[in-house]
Amino acid sequence: MTALPPGQAPPAAPMAGVTTGMGWRRHRRAGAQNVPVTTAPIATAQTRTVRSERPIDLAATVSPLRRGLGDPCHRETPDGAHWHASRMPTGPVTYRLRQLDRCGVDAQAWGPGSAEFLERLPHMLCLDEDLTDFSPEHPKVAEAHRRNPGLRMLRTGLVFEAVVPAVLEQKVHTRTAHAAWRKLVWRYGTAAPGPAPDGLRVMPDAETWRHIPSWVYHRANVEPQRSKTIVLAARIAPKLEEAAALSPADAEKRLRTVPGIGVWTAAEIAQRAFGDPDALSVGDFHLAATVGWTLLGRPIDDDAMIEYLEPLRPHRYRAVRLLGLAGFAHKPKFGPRTPYTDHSRI
């Protein structure tokens, strides 16, 4: 494996959950060598280029970061760049990722957390993942894997950042969760550092989430059960962050010590924070039926899905993502949609 020398980059261009856990959306556009990161004042971008012997499909890999088209923390610009604002342990960061070529990604970062983010970038993009034990036998899964060799899991290592939107997405329509996320981040988040696209925000820190008044959650259409779960998680955020260094089983146990975080929510968090390729969103409103229709031609329930996907362990979530990216995932529509509930009017 090789790495490009770092340097100054050009200026940036001006029910459990409903659908988010499945990864059905279609996105189109081995380890990485430890490349030194350039250091510079906060106002100047720090840069890094990472490469891998295997392809890297940047768009597909980072797509789980985005919580809807209007996500205040994420932006995709016409030049193909992916902008995101996060809160690293060392401080806020704005980063811009761009597909360099089939096996390379360019990164720019601004803010106090820049150096830490760039140091962790290969880890985030799972450039160290080993797929030697992933040999799917089902022809659709095998074909989906062949078509999408660049899909990586996502491993941000930022647990609380994944907790809040996952809790907001519990047992509601996706549009309801995304609207609540936008309202709360716009109100309590902070401006992203550096030359970020207009409106890019850093999500509030745990202490801020902990002290958001209940009536504000209510006006954002978040009922007491979900808001209480967020507050409880915020109180032990440092302990939750430690889960990133635990085994998948122990990490799930740590997450589920929070009342209101169950198997579905823990999986949604693991898919983004831990890069867990086996984090199946059991309990998702659509997932089991979609897996059944896609692979068996008939609907199945959660228990049958778990049994059927067992041979794919520890890559069950990877298989689900691949089916979505390849356009194979489908489920016939029967009957009316689940009714929309506006809790803010109750």
Q: Language model features by range: what are they?
A:
Residues M1-A16:
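Extreme N-terminal basic, low-complexity initiation segments
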Residues P14-G21, P36-T38:
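Residue-level detector of intrinsically disordered terminal segments
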Residues T2-A3, W24-I346:
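HhH-family (HhH-GPD) DNA N-glycosylase catalytic core used in base-excision repair
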